[in-house]
């Protein structure tokens, strides 16, 4: 969802995106061009297309929703490095304006990037955007920059509805065979904690789901939205002619994440002290998250990837690390909160996060197939 902002704010974000892109390729226009992102000549517009009219259709053509977001932008960048042709599904004129100001694209999709306007709650526009693509990366999410936490109960409901529309559009579009869905680690970690209930797993892995009632009762709207959206996606894909994989990243960090991903980050950190105490607060570099998306997508082609994948780089264990996260995001740190965080650092964590499934996939593709696309259980 787009939000009107000041020209100065938008320009600062554009410059950060441009710098991050060039830095990722080693700097310089030549490096960007070699990877498929080229500076445009003069004031060339970003091309707007509709459905199959734009971008060469084929097995290396994919569509990315939310491609101008922090994660979506990194996924597009990584896809181009892997030789894919990408359609960016944009929702607002502001998103299109950002791309124009970046001047990183050539005309008529010559750089491997095309754009199409698509509303993730409108199945017809999604169908047109996906037509001719072999796969879809659904990275878009709803945020409410006017909200105190960056995310509201209404946003959670919208995200679940959008997930259903995206999957239905994928199923309806004949060319689409695979979908990589961006969820969150928060869809795995929030449950009512019964200290004496030995049935509750110590290891938190892809088999664990957050309890929607618990999230609702504690107003953990971001976690609720991600959990409900992912469950909705799995229900919609079950028994259909579509391969679905979900990536569940931890708090996504990286260059400029305070400006470019602040609302989602602040929403993610609601309840962070409890996660810190339980050993469940983790971070993931945006580059790691993007690479995970592409790697699972490619592994889906030979049935060596399926189900859910938890993605993180680092588990935050010390109060000092948590304080630094808050500082980077500009979150006021109250004395009581600081004391609570300090106390949590003195207690052993009750849970262990597990990322072995993704680690195995990222380390090698030469392994036996053991995943089942429709074995995800949450009911």
Curated annotation (Swiss-Prot):
CDD domains: FR_SDR_e. InterPro entries: 3Beta_OHSteriod_DH/Estase (IPR002225), NAD(P)-bd_dom_sf (IPR036291), NAD(P)_dehydrat-like (IPR050425). The keyword Iron does not apply. Gene3D superfamilies: NAD(P)-binding Rossmann-like Domain (3.40.50.720). Keywords: Lignin biosynthesis, NADP, Oxidoreductase, Plant defense. NADP(+) binds at residues 66-72, 98, 119-120, 139-141, 226, 249-252. This is Cinnamoyl-CoA reductase-like SNL6. It comes from Oryza sativa subsp. japonica.
